[in-house]
């Protein structure tokens, strides 16, 4: 009886710790896998990878009705998470273009983080993409300057500048700057483009993004 009880305890602990050690965003990735099982991902689509600015763009297809889009953004993700789950985020798909929006949360997660580290993280993910898709178009959308994260703007601006310089040198790559279109006539970030949390965008914000993104869409 003691042996049975001991075995039960060991099994219980094993199950408990196996659940506890699942990495952050594991469930999001499982949800993507389920979606891909329910419907085979279309080939030659535009694949969106990144954080909540994509996640909350649930009706993105209606903004680009002539494009086939696969949205694999997951809220709260950092570039480190894109790197950790790169195989899951890239292997199931055969896109003609990948567009990335990520980096804000890296700074939000660690306010002392240097811009160079975020640029390094981005280059790592870019390299992972190129290992699988050497010739497709890859674009990076600049980090927006969310009012709720104003103290992080200096690092974000530096990272944007360095990623832009990197992408300019790469073939079949582009840096999509959405920061200017989100400013008013005086160069200030328009708060009316954000919902109450001053982090996520209103439909009007996405309309402005669409205007900037369209020339880059394949």
Segments predicted by a language model, with ranges:
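Generic structural signal for well-ordered alpha-helices
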Residues: 86, 122-127, 160, 164
């Amino acid at each position: 009886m003691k042996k049975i009880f001991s075995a039960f305890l060991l099994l219980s602990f094993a199950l408990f710790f196996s659940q506890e050690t699942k990495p952050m965003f594991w469930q999001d990735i499982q949800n993507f896998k389920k979606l891909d099982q329910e419907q085979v991902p279309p080939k030659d689509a535009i694949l969106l990878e990144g954080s909540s600015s994509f996640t909350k763009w649930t009706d993105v297809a209606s903004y680009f009705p002539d494009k086939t889009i696969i949205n694999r953004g997951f809220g709260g993700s950092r570039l480190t998470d894109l790197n950790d789950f790169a195989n899951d985020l890239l292997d199931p798909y055969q896109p003609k273009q990948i567009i990335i929006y990520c980096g804000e949360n890296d700074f939000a997660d660690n306010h002392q983080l240097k811009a160079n580290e975020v640029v390094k993280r981005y280059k790592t993910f870019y390299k992972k993409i190129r290992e699988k898709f050497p010739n497709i178009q890859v674009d990076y959308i600049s980090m927006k300057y969310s009012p709720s994260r104003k103290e992080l703007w200096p690092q974000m601006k530096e990272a944007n500048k360095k990623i832009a310089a990197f992408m300019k040198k790469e073939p079949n790559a582009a840096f999509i700057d959405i920061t200017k279109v989100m400013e008013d006539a005086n160069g200030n970030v328009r708060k009316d483009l954000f919902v109450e949390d001053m982090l996520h965008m209103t439909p009007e914000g996405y309309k402005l993004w669409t205007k900037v993104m369209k020339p880059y869409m394949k």
